[in-house]
Design a protein with these regions (language model features):
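Catalytic phosphate-handling regions of large nucleic-acid enzymes and associated NTPases
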Residues: 1-243, 303-305, 529-538, 543, ...
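C-terminal interaction appendages of subunits in large macromolecular complexes
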Residues: 6-11, 182-691
Length: 691
């Protein structure tokens, strides 16, 4: 063997080239033959082979169930040379009402659960085709699609199904190929049909108009989609992310208690793991106030019950569950499908257009097939009519012939018939020689000729093809259409900490030495005129005192003004809570104030209204009025509230309505009073005017 010339049975190759070629072959095999659906029928090869094998095995929806192992064997042996587990898993998903929006397989037995339980072994479960699967294969015998050789070229299998329903959208698809993935959500059949009809009526329709019919995904598990931005992005670009939130209600119980009842969870969320995660959050102290957690789901539907203490706000607990568990989840949409054997990311209109083009080809091929059959029948009927018109001569010709072949040849020569017509005459029963039977032949011939005219007109007019598609779609909508399960909410409900905190009245205290704390108003109670009050001390030592004390709520904004003219912003709930006698937290640990910077004013603000103002005064007698709305952008790192001269300090700030009377007083007992309107509003960084 000469390795240099390549003679013999071994050829030298570069391993880099061979690895590149082999990997590309493998990648394309996964992309085209396993992981991605065809845009026309919405099926991956394994699903297409399962449905076709079930039809070939006579497993129609009105026939008895057959063992799942039987169809797995049919698929493996004839069409799909892969593992039996992968085929059975695909069958199981087609039969799970929590995985597939419109079931393709009617399963009998244990096919798993939303808790993540596996289906029973294939030797125990039984299956047959669902009605939707039957219409996917309807007219396949009429040469509507191309057939290709199977893996060993011993049989033929369809390269695509006729797909009378748009399966890619109504059931969606998910798959991971090499270097790409698809994740198409299921949709409501009635809405998709309405969108297709809109496209048939107006081929120039834009995606926003289509979205008036196809409003968004419709998951088999229901739940609620938050916002439309992710849907709009997916429909226009082929990619988007939608947030799905569980359907939950708060129900009252005895003794002022409440419970949260979850009846629908996001798509593809494991219910058992969801409940485990809630229990773990309670155990870890992340969520407090839950006294009982149980799963009351049964054949009537899902029901997860979360019982709460009577001293918690149910909405807050529910928001915490949304925040920390899969009760709120995201679904990343990637509308990737095979178009002419090549993977493409498609928008909503492109998917609908490709489906309609496929249906036009199916209808056209079916019409050609039916036209050929009709012409064949007309040809036979013409021969029978000739025979009946010359009945005596035909009978004599047949009687005088020695055998059937001679009789056939004689009929062809004497009456100018084709061999098929002559054979039909010989096959005709004597009862058809009666007058009534002759009329039936004449009537059938008229009907067949009308059918031929109609079929030819369909082939000549694309609008008639579209009308047929429209009629078929409306029939599918009437037969399989149902109400939307997933609720679409225009409220994006982007959750922040405030959603998770109950709004309650609080008392905020800042001491002279710069310690701050928050207490609930429940720590204080009304006392009569002679009451001695309660200790609200700042620790064990009595060397500190309260300098600022005011009422607010956990949701209010607290603006901290310093002597250096800066302002800092915190939410009420962000201030650390402490007991009545506790010292509190050093304010330098809460706010990024500089050395020598002190809090001189604290203003609680519910809303930043344009008709309210911050009125400021400095130790040099400068005053300034600034619109409250200018402080709405206040960041935790602080903003300039007033520009100060050297050695000047901000000493006071008050919230006004713009029409107040202002009094400035000095330590020497001199005061001035003036109308606030005498001071014009200035920007945040302005210095102010002489007071």
């Amino acid at each position: 063997m000469d390795l240099e010339t390549g003679t013999g049975k071994v050829l030298p190759v570069y391993i880099e080239e061979e690895m590149q070629k082999s990997y590309i072959d493998y990648a394309m095999s996964v992309i085209v033959q396993r992981a991605l659906p065809d845009v026309r029928d919405g099926l991956k090869p394994v699903h297409r082979r399962i449905l076709y094998a079930m039809q070939e095995a006579g497993m129609a929806s009105n026939k008895p169930y057959k063992k799942s192992a039987r169809i797995v064997g049919e698929v493996l042996g004839k069409y799909h040379p892969h593992g039996d587990i992968s085929v059975y898993d695909a069958i199981v998903r087609l039969a799970q009402n929590f995985s597939t929006r419109y079931l393709m397989v009617d399963g009998h037995g244990n096919f798993g659960s939303v808790d993540g339980d596996s289906a029973a072994a294939m030797r125990y479960t039984e299956v047959r085709m669902a009605k939707v699967a039957e219409v996917m294969l309807e007219d396949i015998e009429k040469e509507t699609v191309d057939f290709v050789p199977n893996y060993d070229e011993s049989l033929k299998e369809p390269s695509v199904l006729p797909a009378k329903v748009p399966a890619l959208l109504i059931n969606g698809s998910a798959g991971i190929a090499v270097g790409m993935a698809t994740n198409i959500p299921p949709h409501n059949l009635s809405e998709v049909v309405d969108g297709l009809i809109m496209l048939i009526d107006n081929s120039d329709i834009e995606i926003p108009e289509l979205m008036t019919a196809i409003k968004g995904p419709d998951f088999p598990t229901g739940a609620t989609i938050l916002g439309t931005e992710g849907i709009r992005s997916a429909y226009t670009t082929g990619r988007g992310i939608v947030k799905i939130r569980a359907q939950a209600e708060i129900e009252p119980m005895q003794k002022g208690k409440h419970r949260i009842v979850v009846t629908e969870i996001p798509y593809q969320v494991n219910k058992a793991r969801l409940i485990e995660s809630i229990a773990q959050l309670v155990k870890d102290g992340v969520i407090e106030g839950i006294t009982d957690l149980r799963d009351e789901s049964d054949r009537r539907g899902m029901r997860i019950v979360v019982e709460l203490r009577n001293d918690v706000v149910p909405d807050v607990i529910l928001n915490q569950l949304y925040k920390h568990t899969k009760l709120q989840d995201s679904f990343g949409i990637i509308m990737l499908a095979l178009v002419d054997g090549h993977p493409r990311v498609l928008n909503l209109k492109e998917i609908l257009v490709h489906y309609l083009n496929h249906q036009k080809e199916v209808i056209t091929r079916r019409t050609r097939y039916e036209l050929g059959k009709a012409k064949d029948r007309a040809h036979i009927l013409e021969g029978l009519k000739i025979a009946l018109d010359n009945l005596d001569a035909v009978i004599n010709t047949i009687r005088s012939s020695a055998n059937a072949d001679i009789a056939k040849t004689a009929l062809v020569e004497k009456f100018t018939l084709s061999l098929r017509q002559a054979q039909a005459i010989l096959d005709m029963r004597l009862q058809r020689l009666t007058g009534l039977e002759r009329k039936k032949i004449d009537d059938e011939y008229i009907d067949v000729m009308e059918t031929i005219d109609w079929l030819e007109s369909v082939l000549a007019d694309e609008q008639k093809v579209l009308n047929i598609i429209k009629e078929d779609l409306l029939e599918m909508k009437k037969k399989f259409g149902d109400a939307r399960r997933t609720i679409l909410s225009h409220d994006t409900s982007s959750m922040d900490m405030e959603d998770l905190i109950a709004e309650e009245d609080i008392v905020i205290t800042i001491s002279h030495q710069g310690y701050i704390k928050r207490q609930t108003l429940d720590n204080f109670r009304n006392q009569k005129r002679g009451g001695v009050g309660k200790t609200g001390g700042s620790g064990k030592k009595n060397d500190d005192c309260a300098e600022h004390l005011f009422l607010s709520t956990t949701h209010h904004n607290i603006l901290f003004f310093t002597n250096k003219g800066r302002v800092y912003r915190q939410k009420g709930y962000e201030i650390p809570e402490a007991g009545r006698t506790a010292k509190g937290t050093a304010i330098i640990n809460l706010l990024p104030i500089e050395q020598g910077e002190k809090i001189t004013a604290v203003i609680p603000v519910k809303e930043f209204k344009t008709e309210q103002y911050m009125f400021m005064a400095t130790d040099k007698g400068t005053v300034k009025k600034t619109n409250l709305e200018d402080f709405n952008s206040a960041r935790k790192v602080g903003l300039i509230a007033i520009t100060l001269d050297e050695n000047e300090q901000l000493i006071g700030v008050e919230l006004t309505d713009g029409n107040s009377e202002i009094i400035l007083a000095t330590r020497n007992g001199i005061a001035i009073r003036f109308d606030e309107q005498d001071v014009r509003p200035m920007g945040r960084t302005a210095h102010g005017v002489r007071g």
